[in-house]
From Swiss-Prot:
NCBIfam families: PRK05406.1-2 (NF003813), PRK05406.1-3 (NF003814), PRK05406.1-5 (NF003816). Keywords: ATP-binding, Hydrolase, Nucleotide-binding. CDD domains: LamB_YcsF_like. It comes from Bacillus cytotoxicus (strain DSM 22905 / CIP 110041 / 391-98 / NVH 391-98). The lineage of its organism: Bacteria, Bacillati, Bacillota, Bacilli, Bacillales. It comes from the Bacteria. Its EC number is 3.5.2.9. One of its GO terms (molecular function) is ATP binding. InterPro entries: Glyco_hydro/deAcase_b/a-brl, LamB/YcsF/PxpA-like. Catalyzes the cleavage of 5-oxoproline to form L-glutamate coupled to the hydrolysis of ATP to ADP and inorganic phosphate. This is 5-oxoprolinase subunit A. It catalyses: 5-oxo-L-proline + ATP + 2 H2O = L-glutamate + ADP + phosphate + H(+). HAMAP family: PxpA. It is an enzyme of class 3 (hydrolase). The keyword ATP-binding applies.
Amino acid sequence: MISIDLNCDLGEGFGAYQIGNDDAILPFVSSVNIACGFHAGDPSIMRQTVEKALQHDVEIGAHPGFPDLIGFGRRIIGVSPDEVYNYVVYQIGALDGFVRAAGGKMHHVKPHGALYNMAATNLEIAEAIARAIHDINPKLYLYGLANSAFIQAVKKYELRLVQEAFADRTYQPDGTLTSRTEKYALIKNEETAIHQVLQMVQEGKIKAMDGTVITMHPQTICLHGDGEKAVQFAERIYRTFRLNGIFVCAPK
């Protein structure tokens, strides 16, 4: 039987501001990435989100990003590998405190936004992230873009990479994600997104924007929880997998 992890970014509100419907999407995912206070999240939201994730028995990961609340961590920032290391250690440590306090165990780390995209093509940045994870807990998985620089980075630090693909994003011929500044970066048609996901999981391939066929064998699929129909889409993908004999579970 084919198995696949479904992950979602959660806890991305801040103070009085709420983004996404975390409660409604939790039943349809097997792992979650929780914002750690830099691009989104705050101590109260982090604690609440950790406790909800544990109640739903999903695996918990840290979702470190750039210290850029206004830009939601999606803006490129000129940083050194040492700064990236510090950012990631700080954020993993913050979330891990809440996970431990709630009686849980952290499962993985998945960088957010611009940090994620930079690491996918910049080996020094990817290695800084991998080193941070290794120095805190080398048993943690690293969730990173399939076919990217993350592969070399985890080999250097002997970590376990979970190769990730996106349900609602388009791809460039080199396997990178289409920038969110581009018109067709997001797939808004549900049927198209479902077809793309099944093609990736069942056939190990995906079509880039120009029609190029890319070989890809993802182990986890990212769902975005902040879209207008995010919950409906998450439920549909979950049920589509079940109907096609695909078992939804996080890496163990």
